[in-house]
A protein has these predicted regions:
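Alpha-helical cap/lid subdomain in secreted, periplasmic
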Residues: 2-17, 26-273
């Protein structure tokens, strides 16, 4: 929803429809099973796929021989992903494909009463490596959430061992984690540095010297007061400060750790003379 909200505020005239074809608990095999009914029927032109968290499994960790279990999970994910690739390639309406490397399973955060599945994130990373290789081979887009989010978790845990962008169960990100992922996705699309709007007014001449993504009219400079009419073609992204459903993280927490505001949410006014 954060990605959709960014598009809506920054590109209000863009004819865009976004469909969620996923269901919680999915893995690559489920995506294959429901591709026709969930995806193809909607006739998308741009497809974003994410899997890995559930494909890496749960029950086989913290047991002797877990490495064999991990190998089996990766092999099965690879097999099912191969089937998914063929379904995607056969759908000629799909012009662009992006693969998302899963958010991490946080094995390091200190969470009371929550078991740590040691080695699970390494399995996820192996699946992500497979996704990256396929993306490069097929000319598809690729965004790796895992690496950056692991680095961010490490940073915040230096001062608070209970802090994480991966939620209260090591798996499901709170709103802060979702905001981080939205930032990484939008940055990968090349949107860093795109302003909401920028304008420069010369007060003495009562003239707009520069207008970017906006229009300035009716400039007045009277009684030590400058006034003008401002029409922007975009709106700033509203960063929420409220958690949901008993969780702790908010989008505001995320923008303290990633430069979303500086790179993607600047609305700048400059006045000279």
């Amino acid at each position: 929803s954060y990605i959709w909200l960014y598009y809506m505020t920054h590109f209000p005239e863009l004819p865009l429809r976004i469909y969620n074809g996923g269901i919680g608990g999915d893995c690559a095999s489920h995506m294959v099973f429901r591709f026709d009914s969930d995806i193809k029927i909607k006739k998308p032109t741009y497809l974003v796929c994410s899997f890995g968290m559930n494909d890496s499994g749960y029950d086989g960790y913290n047991k002797p021989g877990y490495d064999k279990y991990a190998n089996k999970q990766v092999e099965y994910a690879n097999t099912e992903f191969g089937k998914l690739q063929q379904q995607i390639l056969a759908d000629k309406k799909i012009k662009n494909v992006v693969l998302l490397g899963s958010s991490p399973y946080d094995e390091n955060v200190k969470l009371e009463g929550v078991e740590t599945l040691h080695g699970k994130n390494e399995t996820i990373k192996r699946i992500i490596e497979m996704q990256a290789e396929v993306a490069q081979k097929r000319g598809w887009g690729f965004v790796n959430f895992n690496t950056v989010m692991c680095e961010l978790n490490k940073e915040i845990q230096q001062s608070d061992s209970t802090a994480t962008f991966c939620g209260g169960d090591r798996i499901h990100p709170d709103k802060d984690g979702h905001m981080v992922m939205a930032y990484l996705f939008l940055k990968a699309q090349g949107l860093a540095g795109k302003e909401v709007a920028y304008f420069h007014i010369n007060a003495t001449n009562r003239k707009a010297m520069e207008e970017r993504n906006c229009r300035i009219t009716h400039i007045k400079n009277e009684n030590d007061t400058i006034s003008f009419s401002y029409l922007s073609r975009s709106l700033p992204f509203p960063v929420d400060t409220i958690p949901r459903w008993g969780t702790k993280g908010t989008a505001r927490d995320a923008v303290r750790q990633v430069p979303f505001m500086q790179e993607m949410n600047q609305e700048i006014m400059k006045v000279t003379d």
